[in-house]
Amino acid sequence: MSAKEIKFATDARDRMLRGVEILTNAVKVTLGPKGRNVIIDKAYGAPRITKDGVTVAKEIELADKFENMGAQMVREVASKTNDLAGDGTTTATVLAASILREGAKLVAAGMNPMDLKRGIDQAVAAVVVEIKAKAKKVKSSAEIAQVGTIAANGDATVGAMIAKAMDKVGNDGVITVEEAKTAETELDVVEGMQFDRGYLSPYFVTNADKMRVELEEPYVLIHEKKLGNLQAMLPILEAVVQSGRPLLIISEDVEGEALATLVVNKLRGGLKVAAVKAPGFGDRRKAMLEDIAVLTAGQMISEDLGIKLENVTIEMLGRAKRVLIEKDTTTIIDGAGTKATIQARVAQIKGQIEETTSDYDKEKLQERLAKLSGGVAVIRVGGVTESEVKEKKDRIDDALNATRAAVEEGIVPGGGVALLRARSALSGLNGANADVTAGISIVLRALEAPIRQIAENSGVEGSIVVGKLADSKDHNLGFDAQNETYVDMIKAGIVDPAKVVRTALQDAGSIAALLITAEAMITDIPAKDAAPAGGGGGGMGGY
């Protein structure tokens, strides 16, 4: 075990605070509409240019081990806020640094760190209640666009695109962000349920130009096991032929004789049919087949449920308005399932999401939820250079997370105004003793930090902005840093999701309060490099 270096009390806190300040100084320049870019060197390829606080924080590693410990703890604030709310990382970093800076001063002056921590926790809890109470529910597509625009650093096209995507796929729908092959940024929406299985034989293709199967008003047979021969299916196939409608078969696999018979029938024109493999594996496959059954108002044919293939009637088949099958994907559009049964299934999946502890399971359940709820939207981010695409993708990711958070918990005035106004929740709050009250005052001062930084990044003195807003009785009045004017933030569309503001403060308060109470820091003593081997003497090749 290697020897350790230990720092105590003021010495430890000073070194830790230095690391926090270095990280915060690099991150805080990105805050607000006039925030600056940070250029990050990469081991290979072009440097990365970003205005995303968490991306900057994740790149910072300091040479001094004690300074680095402080920086890494605040980096944790940014990461945690990003994981929970998806945005607000720079705000969280600025708040944490402010709380820690003030707290370290008071500890150095002889105050009790544990009492200061109690005061900080008490104040944060009171402010969170205030933010939740003041949050306004997001109702219109225009409000969603405003949130997206602010989170994307004032890019209105991004805000409009996200609002359109959410409008198409619903609040539970999946919206993914990918890099495009072109210079344009575009939105691609897949309506209905899509899964990643294509046709089992190219002979099923009905549209030779696009190499895809198009079935109008088809019946859908959902079968859990493999189909090896069609003997058991003959009654249902005859019933489908008489109905004159096409048939989509979804099963674990269709092989050998069964597949050959279907292909021959399709080519002869007797039966419009296509077969695809069931999506997923194991228990997840069964669950997805049940989802398809709910969506199409059909029944899953499973011997576990006591249903045999030879006993299937046409009423047990699912129905859809349209089915499109390509080489690798199948899309079921406008299934016949009733709204009530689909909503019941959605509620069941939401319950499973809340119960599961596995991130992987959660992601897969979320995908199933989206497919049932309305579809998938893909925002393809274009740009002239790779650096531009990556920078834009960072902003769109932030904007997407912010809009989801806004839909979840509502919006509050943006630009740091919500935190500044939330100081009113602390005006009558007193601690059990003077040190606890001092902890409350630390948070009171820290609530000004984000708006000060936004003002300073736009070239305006922060104290003047804070003073002017403090004098006003209008709770929505704030500083529009883009145009350097004072406006009603809600009317001007400068809003933040309440969840982002709340999470940023909670995470900042939690980590900063812990760091204030740290009394010792321990790190490895760096190993000294071994002395280089001596050079060869005379006659050893050193002519």
Curated annotation (Swiss-Prot):
PROSITE patterns: CHAPERONINS_CPN60. It is an enzyme of class 5 (isomerase). Signal peptide: none annotated. It catalyses: ATP + H2O + a folded polypeptide = ADP + phosphate + an unfolded polypeptide. Belongs to the chaperonin (HSP60) family. Together with its co-chaperonin GroES, plays an essential role in assisting protein folding. The GroEL-GroES system forms a nano-cage that allows encapsulation of the non-native substrate proteins and provides a physical environment optimized to promote and accelerate protein folding. PANTHER family: 60 KDA HEAT SHOCK PROTEIN, MITOCHONDRIAL. This is Chaperonin GroEL 1. The gene is groEL1.
